[in-house]
A protein has these predicted regions:
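Rhodanese-like catalytic fold shared by cysteine-dependent sulfurtransferases
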Residues: 1-21, 28-66, 75-108
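Short, surface-exposed ligand- or partner-binding patches at beta-edge/loop junctions that are enriched
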Residues: 69-71
Length: 108
């Protein structure tokens, strides 16, 4: 099972109107400075890094709606997606995080 998506795939999913939740787990000020259209902010990355696996319970949503987690460079969101999958949620992390997303938007 695929556990992550790259920026190009996420962009295609958004364009196609695929029903997904994009959850940015970075701090609110980071989400405010740069964000993926349609994403929501749930600052849990620090809690996850400190070993609070239950922090992901705050972002579990509607059953059957996949979640794509986003962080700065891909590490924290990968862990968040792993923890969500342990709870039975279809979850993916954004490969390379927001950095990869921003680079994909810059074009050639």
């Amino acid at each position: 099972m695929k556990t992550s998506v790259d920026a190009a795939t996420l962009k295609e999913w958004i364009k196609a109107g695929r029903k997904i939740r994009i959850v940015d787990i970075r701090a609110p000020e980071q989400h405010g400075a740069s964000r993926i259209p349609g994403s929501e902010n749930a600052y849990i990355s620090a809690a996850i890094k400190q070993g609070d696996a239950d922090a992901v319970n705050r972002i579990v949503g509607e059953a059957g709606v996949p979640i794509v987690t986003v962080c700065n460079q891909g590490g924290s969101c990968r862990l968040a997606a792993d923890l969500l999958r342990e709870r039975g949620v279809e979850a993916y992390s954004l490969e390379g995080g927001m950095q990869a997303w921003l680079e994909s938007q810059a074009g050639p």
